[in-house]
Amino acid sequence: MLAKIGLLASILVLNLVGQITPQFSENLPDPDPQSGQQPQNYQPSYNKDYSPRYNPLYTGQQSADPNQFDNTLVDGQSPNTYKGYYDGRAGGGGLGGNVVGPGNNLGGLGPQYDPFNRNSIGSAGVSYRDAYTDEDNFCPEHWVSFRQTCYRFIRSPKRNWAEAKKICKAHNADLINVDNVEKHSFILKNLILQNQRQNRFFISARQTGPLNWVNDDNTQLVQIEDSFSMDEQVPLENEDLHDNRFLVQNDLNNQNINNPNQFYNSLPGTVNQRNQNNLRGFIGPNQPYGDNRYVRDRVVYAFSKKRDRWMFMPAYEIELNLFICESKVLYSSDNVNIKLDDKRPYHYGLDINDMERIPRGPYFVKQPNDTTFDVNKNRLINDVTLSCLANGYPTPSYTWYREVYVDDRLEYQKIDPLAQDRYTISGGNLIIYEPKQALDQGAYHCVAENKFGRIRSESAHLNFGFIMEFNLKRSAETSEMNWGKSIFCDPPQHYPDVRYYWARDYFPNFVEEDQRVFVSRDGALYFSFIETVDRANYSCTVQTLVSDTGRNGPFFPLRVTPNSNYQALIFANTFPKVFPEAPVAGDEIRLECMAFGYPIPSYNWTRQGLPLQRNAYTINYGRVLIIQNATTNDNGEYSCTITNPRKTLMKSIYINIQMRPQFTIPLKDMIKDYNSDVTFICEAFAIPDANYTWYKNAERLDPANINRDRYIIQDNVLTIKFLEKDKDDAMYQCGAQNQLKTSFSSAQLRVLSMKPSFKKHPLESEVYAVYNGNTTIVCDPEAAPRPKFQWKKDGQVIGSGGHRRILPSGTLTISPTSRDDEGIYTCIASNQAGTDESHARVIVLQEIRFIETPPQRIVSKEHDLIFLHCEAAFDELLDIAYVWKHNGEVLKNNHDGTGRIIVDWNRLTVHNTSMRDAGDYECVVKSAVNEISSKTSVSIEGAPGAPGGVQVIQISKTKAIIEWVDGSHNGRAIRYYNILGRTNWNRTWVNVSTHVQAREVDRYTSRQQAEVVNLTPWSAYEFSVTAVNDLGIGTPSAPSPIYSTYEDKPYIAPRNVGGGGGKIGDLTITWDPLLPQEQHSHGIHYKVFWKLKGAIEWASDEIKKQDHMGVAVVNIPLNNYYTEYEVKVQAINSVGKGPESEIAVIHSAEDMPQVAPQKPIALAYNSTCFNVTWQPIDMSRENIRGKLIGHRLKYWKTTHQEEDSVYYLSRTTRNWALIVGLQPDTYYFVKVMAYNAAGEGPESERFEERTYRKAPQKPPSSVHVYGINPSTVRVVWRYVSPSQDEEPVEGYKVRIWESDQNMITANNTIVPIGQKLESYINNLTPGKSYNMRVLAYSNGGDGRMSSPTLHFQMGKTTRNGANTRHGHNINTALILSTLLLISTFLYTSQ
């Protein structure tokens, strides 16, 4: 029975292991912007539900009680001994105990402290309680702990299995033995959190027989179902298998690697004889090695893309992989103090207040960059600058070196500006004057130094850019029509890369890219297929990327020869292509795709097995895929699909992104004790993997020449033993190098010996504690080496016992705290250099407590108000603060920016509540010594929540059965549902069914079902469901997947059937084509019906041409011109015929009129116009043969030919028209024609007529206006004398209008010739302002108007009369005392 229970428990644990992905307990830090990886110094933490330690099914020997520590000795004592003394939170406030540290004199009271629950940890400076309770601190830096064992995930460098084991041994560890499920789960969680999918990790296990894998300690590798992937492996071309120690010459794919029962999956082929010895060196004494065959008998953790999870995979021992080390020996409390020492700031032990003047070694803030000097610009700019910048105190000085090879050995030549006047060093700038490629091209680096040491920069390369000239002539290119064509640029020699442009016929008439034409980054001009318009002269232009220097190539012709055939769709040349060819992380990657073939193809980019990333987008009609700021996560296979109506093809390209070394664990400054040890660790992510070198004061530490008793170098780890200030105080650097770059990380080592000092971190003068709580007083003096501690209370020495404990860090904990613990406490720190002490007074206060709390449960409605209130009693010496929380989040006044939430000390008001306001509200009262809280559960009733899981169970042409799961009822029962839908034709959500009563189909899941009718056939539907209760309509659900209704025949007839027009013999029928959503199937076309009005039989025709849909032209007898026809239209699709439209009556096409207008007469209207009349035309069908639209008048000067005639179109059926724009005193011939929609009829006989002579060309002069009374004025002017080419004057017009109106509103007062040259203008409005002009007129028309415009204002009538001496009443004001004549030229003289 017990065995069965254990088996079931194991199975449950395995299930948990298989589903660990979503169970992380904390947010991950942002990944590295280039590598895409998590920071390598990030160490994940686990909560109780995540760690196997707290798994209730855990069956190991450890206690599952989360309050129990592992029984590991800490300074000779079990951690359980210390557990009771770490209760409480670091810092001054919050749940937890009193921790008194630098800058914090207040503690607190709280519940039992959980050492592995990160949520209970405070953040006041260095938390010594954290240090001694966080299990990871019992392991060295960059190691993680699990079950009293330390683990290190080595992320650089990659090594084969034997060297990986050797490195682990150097760390006093070994390759990990995975012998139980808990450890396996722990490893998987770390691999997931560290985002290492692209890497593989060696463990110790190897295969000893079919399905038998054994760890190095002879324990069995943990056996988990489906944990091995035997069919995935590293391809042979992977750089890991191309290590220079061996040469594998046959392809791995020739063997059967998929058989898990095969004993030793062998690597076929031979090993080069010169490398056999090296290869044998990798194989242990018990490894099988015969017939020069190697075996895949090692195990790695690798991410399976097929199964999307981490699995075991077999591997070759000679592969270069990452690896995992484990060590029980390293798990020690000594690491706590070591880590605390390693966190000493760089100003540790220095009594300097000005942070900017703290002595410090140099460190680079700007590295020199690669520079290209454009030799084509040397006449304008003939110098080049390389720059570096370092900080430090004293300010660093700089030296520059040139890196040269002498006898195949790299040497650094110091640049001396005093000896070579071409060089200048200013600050960190190296300026080279008149640079010459033969002398100056190469790599440079700078060295920054001050009295604390020297550091070197990264290398920067100085290159020389140039572009040679194109060849002067180029032969013609020839291509066949309708076939693809590529024209290569043939650029001149150049450095660095150039951009390509193509000109057509002349420069700068650049070729415009379109769906058919493409200019690639390879420089070529591509045509999907050639057309005759491509026949032209072309020229290629190049421009360097480092300046505006460019070159224009010669023009050459492209000849196009006819060809009736079309090229089938193919990929052009070697497309798809990637630029740059060897992409590096951080580059912008450009993937190009180009195809030849007719018709024009479309392009689509996809990523194999994954969607395109967010930083990727397509341009240039989909031909080009751009990946911005590429990372190693962008590695993979990308496929281009080309499609035209005749063919579809797909081709892939693999991107393998390299990466320059980037430090994930940089060096950090170290302040170490005299005669102690220091370990520098650096780690860089790089592709290919990085190799490491170490430097001291810019000089390389050669492992062959160092003192091996003191210096230990193991790849990226440097250890120095028995530190001495004179020998070891220096600047140290780690160099990570691959074929792309060498990166450096630097740090200062300061060896220190000093007596304890409390100057920077004294104990607080007063420490407030809470009665019966936990109190922690941190004693943190500066000292080297770490001091011993002694505590006194009121002058009496106290020991570590009872309710007081002294931690190895010097921290004093008191738990529980009583009134007897009040007093003066003294911490005494001493080492061999001296002694110092600091004092603190402990005051014990009464804890705070609630006297009023909110109700435990509140029920409210949406848009209502919530009011909460709490009150606490507290000691008068304490200051308290009220904090309100909602679901754990602290609320602030106007928290959401809408003014709804009002936080007023111990009162909380929430206005206009919504469903998001439901949840737990907490009133927290905080003081310096403890905090308390009270929770209230608030329920909000409102409209229902959004349903979920909407899907279609069954669908037909117009109906669908939909199922969903109800969302939250939000306190009220659901009454009914509304079902919304949208289609591929219309993306707007509309109600497709309302007031739906659903049927429950599964009472366990509350799944509902309903039928929707009146859907549109042949449509892709998405559905959404909203629930309705007494309080309103709820939130719509997320859209369902897309479902398509079945096809059906059209349901409606075409609309707006009509027609008419066209040429004689045509019957044109028009209609509105059905909308896409009305077509109900593919293959839509139409059938038209027609017949003479009154006839019985219908004629018909089907119209299938897509380009003229909506119009049909059928042939009828020619003599049926302008005849009424009855027509109708019917829609047809691939399923069947729709209904016929209603009958519409239209006319057939018209014929041209057959009669000419009779007796045309033209009479002169004025000097520039004729009035032409004629006898009305008989409007019979036989004469007009359609509908008369108007008349066309033809006129020309009698002195000109009729071919020079001008036409005037009169769009009316009246029998007269005015022809304007003629010349004065000129004879014209005039003809008239009738016209309809078919054209014009025959011309009438011509008629000759002369226009009048000109209108008067002189305006009247001496125009004056006089007021007669408030409504009458008198106007006088002088006579106008006409010239011989003018018609005699017939009279005059006085034109007057209100000044605020336009002249078109003017009234004309006519004065015939022969009368007195004056006019009285009556009926004017008193007080109004008027404008006035006078003109002469004749048969030739109106003459020019007087100028300027006269402006005057009428006077107002007065009621008060004044008697004259003659006894008559007169108006005091007839018009203003004088008429105001404004010489405003409102209008030009006519």
Curated annotation (Swiss-Prot):
The keyword Lipoprotein applies. Disulfide bonds join 388-446, 489-540, 593-640, 682-734, 779-827, 870-923. One of its GO terms (cellular component) is side of membrane. Residues 1363-1390 form a propeptide. Keywords: Cell adhesion, Cell junction, Cell membrane, Disulfide bond, Glycoprotein, GPI-anchor, Immunoglobulin domain, Lipoprotein, Membrane, Repeat, Signal. Expressed in ectodermally derived epithelial cells from stage 12. All these tissues, such as epidermis, hindgut, foregut, salivary glands and trachea, which contain pleated septate junctions. Expressed by ectodermally derived epithelial cells and along peripheral nerves. Not present in midline glial cells. Expressed in epithelial cells and glial cells of peripheral nerves. One of its GO terms (molecular function) is cell-cell adhesion mediator activity. Gene3D superfamilies: Immunoglobulins (2.60.40.10), Mannose-Binding Protein A, subunit A (3.10.100.10). Residues 1-18 form the signal peptide. Glycans are attached at residues 369, 537, 604, 629, 691, 774, 912, 986, 991, 1166, 1171, 1307. It is a lipid-anchor; GPI-anchor. It is found in: Cell membrane; Cell junction, Septate junction. Residues 362-463, 468-561, 576-656, 661-745, 756-843, 848-939 form the Ig-like C2-type domain. N-glycosylated. Forms a complex with Nrg and Nrx. Forms a complex composed of septa junction proteins Nrx-IV/Nrx, Tsf2/MTf, Cont and Nrg during late embryogenesis. This is Contactin.
